[in-house]
């Protein structure tokens, strides 16, 4: 502020300067900003700002501060209040001036970076610089490109070299918001594979200027939920920050030290991580648990953190990380910039208040409607719980076509050739299934043959023939992972496995083998569902269906990334159908059965020649072939257990463990909504044997129900179209045909392809006939029971009983059929049935009347009910009433609807007369019209539009909408203890005891009996005492290191203040040398000995002094009194005295033995 006043005073604005000083308030912020960007117009704008008429902006800070022009108001305040008010005004003005200065500096640097970035882009496009600086053809300029964001030229060059020419939508909106001044918190949401990692790494590197800061303290902190994700972020960040050239100042070198990165994850040695943190890293990528452990153990000062990122924020803020984040957030400074990124984020930012967001964060929420990639194709299979393993083997062998055995990874030359082929294929406008598409575009243009080997962005070392078959399998628990690992390894597949409690070194080895293509399958829990980029991955299998839609989005997000195609295969049991219905509501996509969809697509034509189903925008549910399932089930139950190998012993044990884990897993997961449970029950009921009997009785014997699930009699008729025709979808058979073509050549391939196509069609035809025959056999119901075989009439009581029972069941079956037909007519799903009923209504009425006369003496009431429901007393609908009574004039919408229906059905009803056709069309129009009472213009629903998706995104959806009212009320209620009843009495605690295995007895289980000691941190949070064990102090004493305080400057020689031993030390031990030069001393000093020879000691005097004799006597007396026995001399003296008495004829001593 003082600088601005001096500047204005030098320009002749003394009056305005004096008025500004007396007011002790800041100028208008807009004016200050503009003046800082255009210094030559400051005086003019300041004059304009001083006019009361021309200043339309209102400054809250200026209005709240007292002005010198108001003497009355100032006079009413005391001197201390006036002083405090002036001090507050000065602080506000200083802060605003700092913000204006920072904004001005940022704008100047941004303009300079944009200008320099354009030069970098031009050089790259024109090809003036050869080698690494040369880029492929493409447009890299424009409003949405990276160089228009004001990035540093070195960072822009690094992005362009690696093929990142155009930012993704999330990067285009998030990066400018993050880099704005003053810094603003950002909450970003975009689907998986959309580039969220670069959206926060690019501003991070640009903010650190690509160089290491000599000031001690962490500058940026990135928190992520899993270790693999942390390693991936570290690899991407180091790659982007490589090759940075800093701006050289006066007397400085442009080649400074690169950014120091640190990764802090669990499973690693604490001593190594102590050394990493003492190395003063700039960026720390960590998991919350281990980072909190180091923070408490080392007592880290996090006040220097300016940039905090919560990657996969919805997972971080769930219950598992509440304690870790609470303590860490209290240690972070309030002036930090906080970023939250995830693929599934709720719209309500109230759920993220723990992150300490500022008052006005920016929400960037993209792809909220699509949620998953448009290149992802999904297939859902209905399976029995006991046949899940068999279904997995059928899927891997017959559909995906995963090869058996461990595959050898390609060498670097073959990989480079493959990347060049992939880049050439992209010229046709198609996205290759090879990895590293962006990298391949630039890689083929460079002359550096080793450049591509350094950056394997799509996954290092993937083998060419393994790319279409790399598959990741998601399971519920680690016990399922171990069980499937044994099963698939025994079957012959090369598998890797990862779960949370696995050792970190083993996890790295397993992931590396899968990335290099040696293993075809990766069996994991949900620990690998977050953020891990596996570009070679094309197939994702959900062995256990995810209970939450958010989990499904993250699982299938591992494939179909960066424009590549991908497949998601999900197995669903009848118990998991409600979760599938919840997923359908969350994705807002239709859920249809495979046989219904393919029949509608064929439209009366041959099913084999129909087009492929739209698996991108629909959820298609089908079954698997029964023959293949039976073969695999027999293999698992017999072949694996009836051997003498160790597998036969381990397999049943692991299966039992997995079954028990499944039971506990089902108890712990959230429940689906009540509406989804209702729909799931209806789906299961439609394929039951009772509904099949109803259809058979009504003359629809050959009709397949809409929903035919696994275990129903007609499941063979509902096999998924992907399994029946995999070549249509480019799966197993197409890959085999390509392999045969490459092996035999194009000349000999014509006959082979034709012969193979004929065989495939013949096999498909035979499979369809076999499925139809098996479906008829499964749906067969005999006309007679075992009590009626070979018996005529009512010869036996059991035969008469079954005959009467059958008549009663027929009545109930007809009643259920009528109810089902009416329900379909109301819901709009029975249009075809209504047409048939209109044509055959007279025949049905005549048949029912004949049945009434024949059975007049039996079940009159029941037949009357059936007749009432079907014919005699059928309730008239709205169309019949309107046809008989013209009560009101039809509305405009009704007239338009009738006209549209008339124009569509004229061709099909041209043979009828005009009056009859008009009446029929009017009635059909009224029946087909929606019967809902909701007017879209005025109806207010009890739910907000899009509430289903928001419930799926919600973090606490386990108790928000899935539970009943009683459960929700119990979660938020609390009880108060009655004071009157126990007033004046001592409350007794229950006698809770537990068995101690060491003491072999029951002991009292009191507080602290579990031996879990807690400590309270400075912020008041209680943490386990193991977080402060003193290992860091021991490590400092062992390494002889003194950690600098936050904000201090590093020393030139050492990164930390290390008390290093002398240079001549050996193995850390001190070694001193004689370096002092002085004259030797005379020999008289040492006597006859040499220098360094020890002194000769005199002989020990053996004559005791009186004091020593007295001490020895005292010690001897103490020993005698302690022993309580007479000494040996006393015993001898007593014996001699007795002998003398016996010699003189006297008696011995009293009590002596004779």
Swiss-Prot record:
Catalyzes what? Answer: ATP + H2O = ADP + phosphate + H(+)
**Name of this chain's protein:** ATP-dependent RNA helicase DBP10
* One protein family per Pfam: DEAD
- UniProt KW RNA-binding keyword: yes
Basic residues: which segments have biased composition?
844-855, 918-927, 1134-1154
Family per similarity comment: Belongs to the DEAD box helicase family. DDX54/DBP10 subfamily.
Single GO MF annotation: ATP binding
Subcellular location per UniProt equals: Nucleus, Nucleolus
